């Protein structure tokens, strides 16, 4: 193989992958729709099967394509799987060594909005889950490891109750980092304050008071962010 061969092959595969993505989006393809085989795509883009195979592998790893084998095999647009993105992003955040300050800046940017939306959109089942989490956190206030896990779960349940998939997906990768930063600094006194704050946020959500729910969440996060570490 000539010098630069692997690099040229990689660049060619990346170029084809970008073209494939652009083509799929332009065609408005939906999850489950058939897009061809390696052979048909290689012919369509006038590249080798190796180049197409590498491009397809990359797009499959990124969650865009589903590669199927057998008599009904071929390439299809993959079904939506936000958990795949969430897991990958969570790992990257942990590798970055996200600081406590950065974590709370992100939470303050997202969570007052999710609380306000939850006040307008939460279903009866979602409100019931929020009540259960507030009650569970109150019972666990003396078990700080369990308490922290339940308290973080409350915040993510509020995001679920916002019924906004983009905001939910933005917050979800922070969960592991939240546990890492909050668990070591939570005291019984802090736990009791958090329980009261969560109950107040829930009350505003139940009252369908979006402005107050957002304000209470913002105040709560500001107080916790300045707790001694």
Per-region residue spans from a language model:
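C-terminal all-alpha effector/ligand-binding and dimerization domain
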Residues: 172-229
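Short loop-to-helix capping motifs
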Residues: 37-38, 162-165, 208-209
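DNA-binding alpha-helical recognition surfaces that contact promoter or target DNA
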Residues: 54, 169, 215
